[in-house]
């Protein structure tokens, strides 16, 4: 069986190590140093969630007021982070082929609005036209926040690494991401023109949440292993019903919480080897591109996801399930 969700980044051995990993302050410092070097930055902060890092990026970029331009194809936690920072989202239309907004759409959307920043997401690892978007941002005095939730290890068309162009770079270490510690995130500050006082997250993650983060990979391996018998489905239902496991989007936004040391250690190890992971995923993507050309959109630059445009999604999911491929953890039914 092939699972496209439920802990796909973890084997039993990796899940066991995740459960028992220990860390210390030095691990957090090593991760911060790696981030500042990799993204040519002034400072790096570690958060318990990617959305917490994004909320702080928005607060610093805008002063906590005005609007923030964001792609209309996005996750609701992005909107939650923007509002946590005191701002409101301004949705920008996306292109059907790239699934990203372009410079013209951004210019039209922001023409008569008080937009203080733009979040560049590079959704599904598909790179935007970054130079043109940067021009629009400079014309309208907007800070540029590169959201790397889907884009770690990817490149723009000119070869520059995603995350090395804007004023702020946000990373997510959430489940199913390129760097996967179940929860976690980072903010890399690449500008000196901040509009607010930097507030490093100091509050510890509650013990119950850390326990959930530790056991999730083992839970996922168990569910996957027993899924065909039907027992895995029962375990999955029971764990969520009793809140032994919670959905990644259900915990709110907490920019005050810092990344636990043990997760910082795991994130550092994964970031060090990200190029190898990207190479492997792009090889797999090439196979999909050749076999499913009629359904594909623009290619991802890091292989984090490979989207297909189909007429009848339910029918496709049912046929995949018959073939032993479980892809039912879909994102949203409709755009924002």
Model-inferred region functions:
Residues 188, 307-311:
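Short hydrophobic/aromatic beta-strand micro-patches
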Residues 16, 255-271, 278, 282-289, ...:
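Conserved glycine-rich beta-strand-loop-beta hairpin in the small C-terminal domain of fold type I
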